[in-house]
Regions:
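Generic detector of bulky aromatic hydrophobic side chains
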Residues: 16, 37, 55-56, 112
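Short Fe-S-cluster ligation motifs
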Residues: 22-36, 61-76, 100-123, 144-150
């Protein structure tokens, strides 16, 4: 239910698999039934879950609640690769000797790009504070297009 074929008017990407994580993220099922059900063999069964390599999560520090000083951690808790793909980075809050920031940090090489973090992110206007950029896509161009800026 998470993976769809790109529409025919999508240019080079027509009929290629894509994921709309905000609508339905990949759950990184241990047996990858999507790969087994794929009629063309376009989806391969990865050796391990983090090897799925669908993309990498990118955090917008300007809109992420944790970077604003609030304790959120929703993306961290939603991640099936918790403490591997997303970790919580503790650091002093700039200009504040009393409070700390508990900010999510994506470990690119361990992120499978499943999108559960994006699907569950409570920030939505204009876009989630964490989005999955598909493998091979330019992160800045992709997020600008998703946010309606390009």
């Amino acid at each position: 239910q998470a993976i769809h074929a790109a529409p025919l008017n999508a240019g080079r990407e027509a009929s290629t698999p894509f994921l709309n994580a905000r609508a339905q993220a990949c759950r990184l099922c241990r047996d990858f039934p999507c790969a087994a059900a794929c009629p063309t063999g376009a989806l391969e069964m990865p050796a391990e879950r983090k090897a799925a390599a669908m993309g990498v999560a990118v955090i917008n520090e300007d809109t992420c609640l944790s970077f604003q000083g609030m304790r959120c951690e929703v993306c961290y808790r939603a991640c099936p690769l918790i403490d591997e793909a997303i970790r919580i980075d503790y650091r002093p809050r700039e200009g504040d000797a009393i409070h700390a920031v508990f900010a999510p940090q994506v470990i690119d090489e361990d992120c499978a790009g499943c999108g559960l973090c994006e699907q569950r992110c409570p920030v939505s206007d204009p876009a989630p504070a964490i989005v999955v950029v598909p493998t091979g896509a330019d992160a800045a161009a992709y997020t600008a297009r998703r946010n309606g800026e390009a």
